[in-house]
Design a protein with these regions (language model features):
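Short, Lys/Arg-enriched, disordered terminal segments
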Residues: 1-4, 123-125
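Hydrophobic transmembrane signal anchors and adjacent membrane-proximal interface regions, especially
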Residues: 5-10, 56, 65-67, 72-74, ...
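Long, low-complexity, charged/polar intrinsically disordered regions in eukaryotic proteins
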Residues: 2-49
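Acidic, aromatic-enriched beta-alpha/helix-loop junctions
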Residues: 42-86, 91
Length: 125
């Protein structure tokens, strides 16, 4: 796996009914994929890089977003509304302030060092 890939284990798994298919997500998958340090965040059932995971966040330029330290923009759409609601209820995310970009922000680490209620798990595990 890529050196810039690691996982954050959720303390409480998130269960989503996705078009009559129940999926239990246990990890955030964190990866950087651009020279400017862009971050992608996905939920994944296990410790593997899977193309069918849901990409929840792309932080294309942390500098230009001007969000508070320890936060980054989480881009969402209606297809992910149920999942976003569950992540919100469990305390993994919080709504952005009215003065910020519309959507959600994930915290507390812009650089993916740690998320609230998660423990880091190396990709090699």
């Amino acid at each position: 796996m890529a050196e810039n890939l690691y996982f954050l284990k959720l303390k409480k798994p998130i269960t989503v009914d996705n078009t009559n298919e129940i999926i239990v997500y246990k990890y955030f998958m964190i990866t950087t994929y651009a020279t400017n340090g862009a971050l992608a965040v996905a939920l994944t059932p296990g410790l593997e890089d899977s193309y069918d995971t849901i990409i929840l966040s792309v932080n294309l330029d942390a500098e230009s977003l001007a969000l508070p330290q320890g936060e980054f923009f989480l881009d969402i759409n209606n297809l992910e509304r149920t999942l976003i609601q569950q992540l919100d209820e469990e305390g993994y995310i919080k709504p952005a302030s009215e003065s910020a970009i519309s959507g959600y922000v994930v915290y507390p680490a812009v650089h993916g060092l740690m998320f609230k209620q998660c423990e880091r798990v190396e990709a090699s595990e």
